[in-house]
Amino acid sequence: MNVYNKADSFSLESDSIKDVIHDYICWLSMTDETRPSIGNVFTAMETFKIDAVRYYDGNIYDLAKDINTMSFDSFIRSLQNITSKKDKLTVYGTMGLLSIVVDINKGRDVSNIKFAAGIIILMEYIFDDTDLSHLKIALYRRIQRCYPIDDDDDR
C-alpha cells in the first residue's frame, strides 16, 4: 500500500476526500512496525483530534471507549451511536473521534477493512456533500498552514 505517497500528493481539486479518509484510517490501523512515515496530509488529519476534544459536550475519551471494535457488527452499531451525536461532534470532531478510537485500540486485532468500511458507511450515513466539502477545505487549509507552498520557487 502506497499510502504515504498518495497522501502527500493530496489535491483539493481532484482527490476524493473519501479516498483520503479511507487511506488515513488504514494508516492509523497499521501496526507501528508496518506504518509508513506520516505524510503532510495525515499530519493535518491528526489535528481533527483537537476539534473532537474542543467541541464535544462531554468527555470524548469516554465516548471513544464506548465504541466497540471487537466485531464488525458491534463496530457499525457503535458508529450509529455516533450519528446520534452528530450535532455535538461536527464533521471535524467525528474524524478526530475515530482517530482517538484507533489510538485506544492499538495493539488489538483491528483490521484496516473494518475501519475503512466503517468510516465510509458513516460518511454515507450522516455526512452530506456540504459536510464533506467543508472537511476537504479545512484539511487543505491545515496542510497549507503546516506546509505552505512557495510559488516563487518556479521563477
From Swiss-Prot:
<comment type="similarity">
    <text>Belongs to the orthopoxvirus OPG029 family.</text>
</comment>
<dbReference type="GO" id="GO:0039502">
    <property type="term" value="P:symbiont-mediated suppression of host type I interferon-mediated signaling pathway"/>
</dbReference>
<dbReference type="InterPro" id="IPR043018">
    <property type="entry name" value="Poxvirus_sf"/>
</dbReference>
<keyword id="KW-1225">Inhibition of host TLR pathway by virus</keyword>
<keyword id="KW-1223">Inhibition of host TBK1 by virus</keyword>
<keyword id="KW-1090">Inhibition of host innate immune response by virus</keyword>
<dbReference type="GO" id="GO:0039723">
    <property type="term" value="P:symbiont-mediated suppression of host cytoplasmic pattern recognition receptor signaling pathway via inhibition of TBK1 activity"/>
</dbReference>
<keyword id="KW-0922">Interferon antiviral system evasion</keyword>
<keyword id="KW-1114">Inhibition of host interferon signaling pathway by virus</keyword>
<dbReference type="InterPro" id="IPR022819">
    <property type="entry name" value="Poxvirus_Bcl-2-like"/>
</dbReference>
<keyword id="KW-0945">Host-virus interaction</keyword>
<comment type="function">
    <text>Prevents establishment of cellular antiviral state by blocking virus-induced phosphorylation and activation of interferon regulatory factors 3/IRF3 and 7/IRF7, transcription factors critical for the induction of interferons alpha and beta. This blockage is produced through the inhibition of host TBK1, by binding host TBK1 adapter proteins TBKBP1 and AZI2, thereby producing a strong inhibition of the phosphorylation and activation of IRF3 and IRF7. Also acts as an inhibitor of the cellular response to type I IFN by interacting with host STAT2.</text>
</comment>
<keyword id="KW-0899">Viral immunoevasion</keyword>
<comment type="subunit">
    <text>Interacts with host TANK, TBKBP1 and AZI2; these interactions prevent interferon production. Interacts with host STAT2.</text>
</comment>
<keyword id="KW-0244">Early protein</keyword>
<dbReference type="Pfam" id="PF06227">
    <property type="entry name" value="Poxv_Bcl-2-like"/>
</dbReference>
<protein>
    <recommendedName>
        <fullName>IFN signaling evasion protein OPG029</fullName>
    </recommendedName>
</protein>
<dbReference type="GO" id="GO:0039722">
    <property type="term" value="P:symbiont-mediated suppression of host toll-like receptor signaling pathway"/>
</dbReference>
